[in-house]
C-alpha cells in the first residue's frame, strides 16, 4: 500500500508542477504522465493482491478520463476567463476521486473521499463566484447535504466497529486491504439508515437528490463533468465497500428499498430532464435518472452477489462516467460558442464544432443503447443479471426489470431531446459568436465520446461468456452508422447556416 500512496503523492506533485510551465504541449505531457502513473500503480497493486478487479477497472478507466478532462480544463479556463487556480484544483480533484476508487482500505477511502469533498466544494464555489447569475446557495447545499451526511455515515461505521470489537482490532481491520480484511459486523437494524444515509445523498437518490441540480449547474464545466460522471457513483461504490464488513439480516428488504427509490429517481430525474432548457440542468437531472438505474443494479448485487450482478453494477458506473463526462464537457463548449446554456434555440452545432460533435453523438448512442456502446452492454448485462436473481425473489426481479425498462425508455427520450442541438427543422434562434469552436476544446470531447465504444470491451473481462457475441458483432455497424450520421448532420447544418448567411 505504501507504493500506491507514494504514486498518489508523486502524481500530485507532478500535476502541481505542470502549472508552472507556459508550454501547452509540456503541460499536456506532464498531466498525461501523472495520471498514467496512477493507472500503472493500480495495475501493480492488483497483481500484488492489494486491490480487487473492481478497483482495477474503475481506476484505469477513470485515469484515462482524467487525462482528457484535465487537458480540456486548460483550454476551458482560458476561454471562460477563470482564475489560474481552476486548473490545479481540477487536477487535484480528479486525483482525489481516482484515489478514492483505488483506495485499498476503508481508512484510506475515508481520507481520500474527504479530500475530494473539500475540493468539490471549492470548485462549486468558484463556479458560483464566476457566474453572472449570482447564486451562492449551490455550494452550501453540496457541503450540508452531500458532505455532512457522508461524514455521519463514516462516523457511524467507525463507532459501530469500535463498539462491536476492541478499538485496536477495529482500527487494524479497517486499515487492512479490502481483499484481506476479516472484520464482520452484525448491524442492528436501527443503525442501517445512519450507515447508508451519506452514500444515498452522494448518489442523489430520492429524497436526497435536491442538492445535485444546482451544484452541478453552478460548477465550471470540467468540474461538472467530474462531479456528475465520477463522484455521484461514489455513493454506490461506497455502499459496495461497506458490504465487505457487514452481515445484513434483512438484505431482501433493503434491496426493495433500493429498487423503489431507484424507480422513483429514474422517473423524477427523467421527467425533469425532459422539461429543461438549460443543458447543464438537463444533464444534472439525467444523472439522477441514471443513479436510479444503478441503484437497481446495486439491489440485485445485494440479494445475490455474483459475477453477473457485480458487473451489472460496475458497467452501470462505467456507462455513467463515459457519457456524462463527455456531455458535460460539451455543455461547456456550447456555452463558449453561443454564450448561453439554453439549447432550445440552438441548431446546427455540428457545423461549428464538427470534431467534438462526433463524441457527443457517441454519448447519445450510449444513452439510446446502440449496439457496440457501453450503454448497450450495461443495459444487456443489467437485464441478464435480473434473470440470475429470479429464483431469489420473483417479485423483486420483476420490479427491477420494470425499472430497467423505464430507464431505457427515458434515457432514449432525453437523448432524442438533446440531439436537436446538432440539427433540427427549426431555424436557430441563437447564433454562434465564433465560426469554429476551438480545437483544444473539441479534441478531448471527441476522445471522451469514443470511450463509449472502447469501454464496451470491458465485458470481455467479466467472465460472462454468453454475452460476448452480442457485444462483438454489431460494433462495426455502429461505427459506420456514427460516420454516416455525422456526415449527414454536418451537410444538413452547413446548408442551413449558408441559407441564413445568405438572408443576412
Where are each of the predicted segments found?
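Hydrophobic alpha-helical transmembrane segments in multi-pass integral membrane proteins
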Residues: 32-99, 225, 235-241
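Residue-level recognition of transmembrane alpha-helices
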Residues: 5-8, 31-32, 62, 90, ...
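Cytoplasmic/organellar membrane-interface segments at the starts of transmembrane helices
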Residues: 131, 168, 350-355, 412-504
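Interfacial segments of multi-pass membrane proteins
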Residues: 294-304, 379-396, 401
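C-terminal ends of transmembrane helices
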Residues: 12-24, 67-81, 121-134, 203-217, ...
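Short helix-boundary/re-entrant hairpin motifs in multi-pass inner-membrane proteins
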Residues: 50, 75, 85, 126, ...
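Alpha-helical multi-pass transmembrane bundles of energy-transducing inner-membrane proteins
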Residues: 25, 86-183, 272-342
Amino acid at each position: 500500500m505504501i507504493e500506491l500512496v507514494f504514486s498518489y503523492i508523486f502524481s500530485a506533485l507532478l500535476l502541481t508542477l505542470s502549472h508552472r510551465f507556459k508550454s501547452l504541449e509540456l503541460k499536456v505531457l506532464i498531466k498525461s504522465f501523472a495520471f498514467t502513473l496512477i493507472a500503472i500503480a493500480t495495475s501493480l497493486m492488483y497483481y500484488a493482491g492489494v486491490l480487487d478487479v473492481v478497483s482495477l477497472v474503475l481506476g484505469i478507466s477513470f485515469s484515462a478520463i482524467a487525462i482528457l478532462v484535465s487537458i480540456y480544463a486548460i483550454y476551458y479556463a482560458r476561454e471562460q476567463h477563470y482564475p489560474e487556480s481552476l486548473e490545479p484544483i481540477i487536477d487535484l480533484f480528479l486525483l482525489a476521486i481516482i484515489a478514492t476508487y483505488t483506495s485499498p482500505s476503508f481508512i484510506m477511502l475515508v481520507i481520500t473521499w474527504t479530500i475530494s469533498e473539500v475540493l468539490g466544494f471549492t470548485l462549486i464555489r468558484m463556479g458560483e463566484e464566476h457566474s453572472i447569475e449570482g447564486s451562492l446557495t449551490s455550494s452550501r447545499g453540496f457541503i450540508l447535504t452531500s458532505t455532512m451526511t457522508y461524514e455521519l455515515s463514516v462516523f457511524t461505521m467507525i463507532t459501530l466497529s469500535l463498539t462491536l470489537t476492541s478499538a485496536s482490532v477495529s482500527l487494524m481491520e479497517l486499515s487492512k486491504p479490502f481483499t484481506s480484511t476479516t472484520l464482520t459486523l452484525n448491524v442492528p437494524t436501527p443503525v442501517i439508515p445512519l450507515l447508508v444515509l451519506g452514500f444515498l445523498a452522494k448518489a442523489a437518490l430520492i429524497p436526497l437528490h435536491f442538492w445535485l441540480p444546482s451544484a452541478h449547474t453552478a460548477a465550471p464545466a470540467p468540474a461538472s463533468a467530474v462531479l456528475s460522471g465520477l463522484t455521484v457513483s461514489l455513493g454506490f461504490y461506497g455502499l459496495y465497500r461497506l458490504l465487505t464488513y457487514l452481515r445484513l439480516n434483512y438484505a431482501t428488504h433493503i434491496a426493495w428499498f433500493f429498487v423503489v427509490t431507484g424507480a422513483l429517481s429514474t422517473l423524477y430525474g427523467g421527467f425533469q430532464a425532459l422539461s429543461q432548457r438549460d443543458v447543464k440542468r438537463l444533464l444534472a437531472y439525467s444523472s439522477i435518472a441514471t443513479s436510479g438505474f444503478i441503484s437497481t443494479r446495486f439491489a440485485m448485487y445485494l440479494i445475490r452477489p455474483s459475477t453477473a450482478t457485480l458487473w451489472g453494477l460496475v458497467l452501470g458506473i462505467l456507462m455513467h462516467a463515459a457519457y456524462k463526462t463527455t456531455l458535460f464537457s460539451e455543455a461547456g463548449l456550447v456555452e463558449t460558442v453561443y454564450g448561453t446554456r439554453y439549447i432550445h434555440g440552438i441548431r446546427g452545432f455540428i457545423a461549428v464544432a464538427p470534431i467534438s460533435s462526433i463524441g457527443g453523438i457517441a454519448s447519445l448512442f450510449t444513452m439510446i443503447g446502440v449496439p457496440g456502446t457501453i450503454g448497450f452492454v450495461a443495459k444487456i448485462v443489467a437485464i441478464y443479471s435480473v434473470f440470475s436473481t429470479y429464483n431469489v425473489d420473483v417479485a423483486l426481479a420483476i420490479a427491477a426489470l420494470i425499472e430497467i425498462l423505464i430507464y431505457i425508455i427515458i434515457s432514449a427520450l432525453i437523448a432524442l431531446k438533446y440531439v436537436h442541438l446538432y440539427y433540427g427543422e427549426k431555424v436557430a434562434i441563437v447564433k454562434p459568436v465564433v465560426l469554429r469552436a476551438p480545437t483544444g476544446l473539441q479534441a478531448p470531447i471527441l476522445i471522451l465520446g469514443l470511450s463509449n465504444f472502447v469501454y464496451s470491451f470491458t465485458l470481455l473481462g467479466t467472465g460472462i461468456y454468453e454475452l460476448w457475441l452480442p457485444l462483438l458483432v454489431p460494433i462495426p455497424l455502429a461505427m459506420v452508422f456514427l460516420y454516416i450520421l455525422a456526415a449527414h448532420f454536418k451537410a444538413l447544418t452547413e446548408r442551413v447556416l449558408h441559407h441564413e448567411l445568405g438572408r443576412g
